[in-house]
Amino acid sequence: MVELFAHIEKDIGPIEVVVFNIGANVHFSILDTTERVYRKVWEMGALAGFLTGREAAKVMIPRKRGTIIFTGATASLRGSKGFSAFASAKFALRALAQSMARELGPKGIHVAHPIIDGAIDTDFIRDNFPERYELKDQDGILNPEHIAEQYWQLHCQPRDSWTHELDLRPWMETF
């Protein structure tokens, strides 16, 4: 991870925005969740978030500016039956974002944690959940471009009104 950030800074330029957007939304009963599955989901969702956030902070602090966005999910707020590994990783990522926001905010770094609550228009949804994809024409599925616009708005916010957490969901998604 250290080498990745150094390479980007050297070859592309200063890193202004980092988006950590990974998750393994696996569905297993708690009795069927193996230690290996639980550990891998946690490593991908929580540990990798920590490593990404730490390295982003290291390059942003000297410039006293930057934005780190950790994408959350409904599971960041509440666990659901069969999603113990995913929910615990997302809970951990949310706590990390809160801690980093408190530590890095005074140093000029905006840390945000948007909650994505709903299906996103992707090939995965089209191929595996056609019934969800059918809701697209009813604005019942999140458009990735619209999510990106909200993330950009987070980055552009003035320091006196930073948003830490917001929910993004289609109008028909219950909450």
Language model features by range: what are they?
Residues 1-13:
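Conserved amphipathic alpha-helix within the SDR
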Residues 14-15, 29, 60-73, 106-109:
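Active-site loop of short-chain dehydrogenase/reductase
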Residues 67-92, 98, 102-106, 120:
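Catalytic loop of short-chain dehydrogenase/reductase
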Residues 29-30, 37-39:
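Substrate-binding pocket helix/loop in short-chain dehydrogenase/reductase
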Residues 53-54, 98:
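A short, exposed helix-loop element centered on a Lys and neighboring polar residues
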Residues 106-117, 132-175:
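C-terminal helical subdomain
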Residues 21-27:
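Conserved NAD(P)H cofactor-binding loop of Rossmann-fold oxidoreductase domains
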